[in-house]
Structure formats: C-alpha cells, structure tokens
Amino acid sequence: MAKKPVTPASKVAAKQAAVRSRHQEDVFTLDPLIDPIFQKGELRSYLVTEPSPSVLKKRSIHTKEYWMLSSLLLIAFYVRMYNLSNPNSVVFDEVHFGGFARKYILGTFFMDVHPPLAKMLFGAVGAIGGFKGDFEFKSIGDKFPDSTPYIFMRQFPALLGVGTVILCYLTLRQSGVRPIIAYITTFLLIIENSNVTISRYILLDSPLIFFIAAAIYAWKKFEIQIPFTFGWYRSLLATGIALGLALSSKWVGLFTVAWVGFLCIYQLWFLIGDLSVSTKKIWGHFFARGIILLGVPIALYLGFFAIHFQLLNKEGDGGAFMSSAFRAGLQGNKIPRDITEQVGLGSVVTIRHVDTQGGYLHSHEHFYQTGSKQQQITLYPHLDSNNKWLIEPYNGTIHNETFVPLINGMKIRLKHINTGRRLHSHDEKPPVSERDWQKECSCYGYDGFAGDANDDWVVEIVNYRSQKGEAQTFVKAINTIFRLRHAMTGHYLFSSEVKLPEWGFGQQEVTSASQGKRALTHWYIETNENSILPPSEAKIINYPKLSLWQKVVESHKRMWKINQGLTSHHHWQSSPSEWPLLLRGINYWNKEHKQVYLLGNAVTWWAATLSIITFGTYVLVTVFRWHLGTPLSTNKHVFNFNVQTFSYVLGWALHYLPFFIMGRQLFLHHYLPALYFGILALGHFFEIFTGYLTSRSKYFQQVAFVLVGLFSILSLVFYVNYSSLIYGTPWTKASCELTKPFSGWDYNCGTFFDTLGEYDIQEKSLASESEIPTETVVVEAKQTPKAEPKLAKQDDHIESPAAAEPVEEKEVKEEVEQLAPPLAVDFEEETPKVEDPQVADVDASSNDEKSVEEKQQQEQQQEQEQVEDESVHQVQQ
C-alpha cells in the first residue's frame, strides 16, 4: 500500500494539533513528574541528583495556565482590596508601624525590635502618597484625617498579599503539583481569613510572608535547574535576595534562612553519594551556595540598616535607648561636647555606667528607708547637677599648684558636689537586691567631717575596653573604662537593671558587689572640669563617630534586650500550643458597633495541621517498615511527595517550634509563616490523593476531586460567614453568636447591632455629624509616645520640665511594654491618651511633699462639703 505524500501544509497542521493537544494536557492531565534515576554502585544503588532538562519544561507555566493565574489574580485582588478605607481609623499595630513610617518621613530616630526594611517601605509608600507626618497614629481608633493617605499605605501590604497568592501557585507548580491542584490550593490561601486580615493593614506580616514566599519559590525553581547553568545561578541569587529581604523585615526570616540551610545540607549529602558528580563539582556546589545564600542576605541586611541610620538622623524618642556615643551622631542631640580629656585630683566629673542605660552616678537629698538610712546613691538618666562629683585624694587635701592625673591603682574619694557627702559603702544590706554578695552604697558625711576609710575607692582601669595607649594607664574622659573597688571590703561599685521603689523615685539601684557580671562594674567619665589644669595643656575631645558596624551591633543589643523584655501579660496573647488548632484570635479593632478580629480559616487551618501530623506519622511508619526490610518506594509520585512534603513540613517546624523557647509575648500572627508552609504541604496531599492513591480507577479519581472541591467550598463558606471580622463590616448579634463554637474565639458579639437596619441609622447620624463645620488646628507633629521609655522620676531641684534631658532608659519591663501591641478599644470607648512624658513625671521627688499637702487640703474640703450638705439636708427637713 502506497504511503500518502507528506506536504508542508500537513506538517504544519500536525504540529499545531500536537501543540493544541499538549496545551490541553498541560492544564488538565499534565503529569509534571519524571521517574527518579538510580544507578548501581559498587555496594548499593545511588540516586542521580542532576535534574533532567524535561523537568523544567514539564513544570513551566503554559499558555492556558495564564488564564488560571489571571482568575486567581482577580479574585485575590478583590478579596484583599475590598473596602480598604474601612475602618477609617487606626487598627491594632498600625499604632506602631504607621507611627514608625511617620518617623521615617520626619527623620526622627526610634527604636523597634524588628529590622528596618518593611517599616522603611511603609515610610516610602506614605511619602509617595503625600504623607507629611502630621498624624501620629497614637491610639487604636484614632480617625485618620484627610491629609493621611492611609488607603494608599494599606494598598501596599494588600498588593504584597496578592503577590503571595501568585507565588503560592508558582511554587506548587515548581514542586511537581498539577495545575488544577495548584489552583485549588492557591484558592484556599486567597480565602484564608487571617492572611486576608493581615494583608489589609499597615502591619509587617504581609511583607514578611511575601518575601518568605518569594524565597521558597526561588529555591524550588533552583532545585530543578541544571547545576552551574545561568538559570541555576539566577535562581540561587534570587533565593539569596529573597532571604535577605525577609531577614531585613523581621527576625523570623532567620528561620527561613535556616530552612534553606538545612535543605542545602540535605542535598549536599545526596550529592556526595552520587558517584556521577565529581569532587570538584561538589566543592563548587558548596562554595556557590555558601557565598550566595549567606553573603547576599548579610549584605542586604547591613545595607538596609545603613539606609535606616541615614534616614533617621535626628534625635528622637528612640535615642533614649542608645549610648551617648550613638546619640552624639544624631542632629539636635544634647550630649556633652568639648570635654577635657585629662582627669585628675580636683576634677569635677560625671560618671556614667557602661552596660546599662541607667545613666549617671547620682545622689540627692533623700534617704534610704532601710539599712543605714543614709543618703541615696542611684543611677539617673538625665543631665543634672546632682550627677557631679569631686575627685579627692583619700588622705589629704587637693593641692592647687600642680595637676595630679588620675592613674590606674590610685586610691581616691568621690565627694558629691551638691550635698557635700562622699560615696560610701559598708556592711549593710542593699535596699532592694537580696544577694549576699551585694552591699549598700550610700552618700555619707557632714560639715567638718573629714571622712573615714569606708569612703575610699581604688581606681582599676579595664584595659581591654579602654582606648589603646595612655587611656590604659591614665584615666581619660570617655576613652577609659574603669572599675571602682571599695578599699575596705574589696567590693566593686555595681549596678544592674534593679530599680528602687517609689521612695527612690524609680531610679536604678547602685550597690557594691563581690560577684555578678563583671561588665556591670564598668564605668567611664563623660564630663570633666578641672580648674588646676592649665587651659593650654587641656586636650579637648568628643565622642568618636561610630562606624556602621558599631551602630548595627549596638542597635541589635538594644533590640534583643527589648525583645527579651516583652514578658508582661497581654490580653490577646496566646501560646504556641494553641496556634495549630486555632484556639485563640486577636481583637484588632472595635468601634462603631463593628469589629476587626484576627481569626484563621478553621477549615484550611485544621486541614494543614492534620496534613503535618499525617505526614509525621507516615514517615515514622515508613522508616519502621524500612528497618524491617521493606524497600522504599521509587514510584515517581510517591518519591516526589516524600521529598517535597518533607521540605515543607521542615519549613513549618522551623517557623513554629522555636516559639516554644521564647519567653516574650506571643500572638496568633506569629504562626502565619508556618501556616504558609502547612498550606503548601496540604497541596501535596491533594496531589497524591487525587493522583497516585486513586489512579487505579477513574471513578475514584473523580470522587477524590469532588471531595477536594467540597473541601474548598466548605473553606469558602467559612470565609464568607466570618468576613465581617475581616473587613469590619456590619453584622448582627444573632449571626455572630452562631459562629462561636469555642470560648477562645472571644470576639464580642455584644458589639454588633441587633439588626442591619440600625447600621443605616448610624451611618446617617455619623454623616450628619461630619457635615458640622469644625475648626482644624494644625499643630507641629510630635513623636509618638508608644515607643518612648517612661521618664524616671526627677529630682526636686529641677525647676521645669524643660530643664531635664530625655530619659535614657526606664526599667526594661516597663520600657518594652510601650513597644508591645496595644489593646483594641471596646465598643466606642477611646483608649486613654498617653501624657506627654516631658510633663507627666517632672519633679516627682519634690512633689511627694506637695502631694501630701494637696491630699490633706482635698480631705478638708470634702469634710467641709459634707458638713454643708448635712446642714442643707437638715434645713430641707
């Protein structure tokens, strides 16, 4: 039989038909997997690790998939952008991160527990939107003025939330999931309530999860590239960049870096066992991954901190957490300048503690209520005349003829300028600390008293912390770190974070100690005046300019300290053990009979948790059977399921389990990065369930797809039923009560009206109120007090608040509470306004006596009013 001639037209038609067939197969029945290749070795078979070129082709996005991606994009855009203008007031941590964006625009320095990138991005978006920093984001429920582009600022995290959705789909495709399953799983992420909520407000979670999702996608793309090709290096570099962005947004990004690191080790182990890979290539893998995956994130992290310091170049409330050397580089600082370097007998100095931010060695005309009941010695954070001490010889008077420098090993006395008493220690129990190795320090003496041996202190220079050279022999202002050893007891002048009670005005306790952290006995001289030293011989110095690395190190010490201090109870905090089961939510906003409450989509949430538990059980059973001699399956579907699901479960564990060892306040939103890994793992369970496990029967596969579809519908129903808590839209009490199966879901149904019609009445009432003309007063923008440490109580000689410097630091526990998430207001009540810290705590020690007099006057007035009331009552009778 003669063959029909093949014409060019028939070739084109056949090619087009093949393309059409391939595209249809790609979308609906495409198998993105290939069989793993095993080769025989001398002792056992080994896995060939180099990906086949066909894998990249099978898992690339095909033409018809763009329609699927477009639909996901539109749905995600609508879900996350819907009604962003509501609420039109501050929600939850917008208090902090909106306030931080404001400070980037104003350039005022602040301190936060998170790296700067996400906050800088919000600041940049605000600046692009025309925000001038005239709104403070002071309290939850504060209404945004027209001048604040809060909708524009909220659009940024919403867009990143949309981007996370697209990355989820692409990641699942790169890890071997069919398009239809990737579509369904991504749809679950779109309608996951907690992810929708956090992507609608000025919060760090949406940027963080987006960067983590980008790192996961880039890594999965990297895994299927042929080693040392352009695509391989490009994907590896993209992974490093995404890791750097995540790490620079929140320290949770460290867990993502650890995840990639573990997978690198895991893959290198198989590379070593692959006999087809040369030793040279193994070293190439090691160095390429190490340099790019560590070097790029570190470079980005430091670079963003450099930009952070450049932008925040003005003195602000955050300076109170930093050292004087750091603050000296900020514009508008009041750190002492032009200091005489040479310190000697007769110098009037201020002595600053090194390793706490308690401030200066200080005394005042107030006395301990325990122990010796002598004059108090404290650390005080303000510049103040009560910080000044005269350096005296221990055994005589000061000779005004010649300057005697202060040197290592010299015995001296320190005389308090304002009260004339000397720094003193003895065998008395400290006022607060109860350790037996600490003794009381006081100020002791009186007119005409020459002092005693308990006033004697020996100067010991700490060479390794002092500037090299003369500062290691002679005590130099700023440049010499020293200890003061009590000559009689051998104890060292010591201070920690312990605070004195109210009678000590909350100032930091100073004791002498024979043990404890050595660094807590380190001091330096900040200001120095000496009339004996000829002006021509005086060397004038200032704080040296800190390098970027020094600023980064100091900032991280403060960030870590503040983070560790977030230990006080918060009403909406929760335990990590509660997160996988979604036992607790967070009240974000509550006003005008509406509420925003962070709650996950329980259907998706519990399914992700179940998939994690199921995979863990499956691994244990498989390993047990393998030990009994059952070989591991090399079926391509099972093999890919094992490898990919293991990587996602590992990511879930690394982003979840570390929270169990953290002592700080924790909240449900801390679980969201782990949840993202759980959803990716859930997608692979859908894949194995609708594919391999039901592949023997088309009917069973159809049933499997129906079950997955019903699961998606159930998740959608949950999203719709609880959407009022996402968007802060009207709801009724009755509808709300039907949605509370657990006591931990403690959103307040009493917030809502009984009927939806009441909201229309409320809207009309609010609209009529807004039409009433009001005078707008433009005031100078203030620094948000939410990040400010409270002022320590000030001494009675200060005449006005303006005379006091901003406090360096309050007790860590109290300071960091200012950085903790605020409580959402209930109903229409406003959160109490924070008093101006420059006014609230002024002159507390002198006000104690005044407060007693005022109290007595109030009591007398109340008694007089009571008498008058009784008289009136008798007349009426």
From Swiss-Prot:
CDD domains according to UniProt? beta-trefoil_MIR_PMT1-like (cd23283)
Q: Where are the transmembrane segments?
A: 109-129, 150-170, 196-216, 226-246, 252-272, 291-311, 604-624, 643-663, 666-686, 700-720
Q: Using the record's annotation, list all stretches that form the MIR domain.
A: 340-394, 403-462, 472-528
Concerning PROSITE patterns, the annotation shows:
MIR
Secretion signal span = none
Question: Which topology term describes how it sits in the membrane?
Answer: Multi-pass membrane protein
Give the E.C. number(s): 2.4.1.109
UniProt catalytic activity: a di-trans,poly-cis-dolichyl beta-D-mannosyl phosphate + L-seryl-[protein] = 3-O-(alpha-D-mannosyl)-L-seryl-[protein] + a di-trans,poly-cis-dolichyl phosphate + H(+); a di-trans,poly-cis-dolichyl beta-D-mannosyl phosphate + L-threonyl-[protein] = 3-O-(alpha-D-mannosyl)-L-threonyl-[protein] + a di-trans,poly-cis-dolichyl phosphate + H(+)
Loss of this gene results in the following: Shows altered cell wall composition with a significant decrease in wall mannoproteins. Impairs biofilm formation and shows reduced virulence in a mouse model of hematogenously disseminated candidiasis (HDC) and using reconstituted human epithelium (RHE) or engineered human oral mucosa (EHOM).
Q: Where in the cell is it found?
A: Endoplasmic reticulum membrane
- UniProt keyword Lyase, yes or no: no
Q: Name one GO molecular function term.
A: mannosyltransferase activity
Region (Disordered) location: 778-877
Q: Which pathway features in its UniProt record?
A: Protein modification; protein glycosylation
User: Which Pfam family, an example, fits this chain?
Assistant: MIR
Sugar-bearing residue positions: 83, 195, 395, 400, 721
Any one of the GO BP annotations? biological process involved in interaction with host
Briefly state the protein's biological role: Protein mannosyltransferase (PMT) involved in hyphal growth and drug sensitivity. Transfers mannose from Dol-P-mannose to Ser or Thr residues on proteins. PMT1, PMT2 and PMT4 account for most of the protein-O-glycosylation activity, while PMT5 and PMT6 may specifically modulate a much narrower spectrum of target proteins. Accounts for the O-glycosylation of the cell wall proteins KRE9, PIR2, RHD3, and ALS1, as well as the SEC20 t-SNARE component. O-glycosylation of SEC20 is essential for its stability. Required for filamentation and early phases of biofilm formation.
What is the annotated quaternary arrangement, including any partners? PMT1 and PMT2 form a functional heterodimer.
PANTHER family hit by this protein: DOLICHYL-PHOSPHATE-MANNOSE--PROTEIN MANNOSYLTRANSFERASE, DOLICHYL-PHOSPHATE-MANNOSE--PROTEIN MANNOSYLTRANSFERASE 1-RELATED
- Give the similarity note: Belongs to the glycosyltransferase 39 family.
The molecule here is called Dolichyl-phosphate-mannose--protein mannosyltransferase 1
Gene responsible for this protein: PMT1
